């Protein structure tokens, strides 16, 4: 899985999917007051599945296009370096490309000597290599597919919980769905902790707080 989509991107997709499902379950429950439990269960379930699927498709398409455009951006930069006759200009461009990602967190993470050395090695390597124009490949399609999968996966627990509305009060079912959402948010934060952090659990608590705050804001603004 993570050879195609990063843990962070997977977590973000699942987070958005949870927010979408929780928002729909709360807003539609209010909008359908007075409807029969069977109607509420059906409408909420279809809406959550449909909206999360649509969001997953849209986000997957955006991910695919963004990845391709980013690859094209770097391809043009590398092509400029390869075809450039001015060696110093090529080194400056190489240093710019190499340091873009590394200096995102801290501008001075690379000193001048390191930049110069990296640029020289990069220019030499690029001059020797054949540069192929990037195309949309299998990995990018798989990333787009995982965006869809993560959004749909986030919807399934809420669809399952709302089936209880045929047997339990709908207010209780909505409460159970919200509690389940908070639990999923916590474990999503724990997942990020294990993958990217120090595993102290704070990210889980932060994720619950952030998710619930955003849910309240979204519902208050009309969903």
Task: Tell what function each PLM region has.
Residues 32, 63, 67-75, 163, ...:
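Transmembrane helix-loop junctions in multipass membrane proteins, especially transporters and channels
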Residues 8-19, 131-182:
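Transmembrane alpha-helical segments and their cytosolic interface motifs
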Residues 187-212:
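Interfacial loop-to-transmembrane junctions
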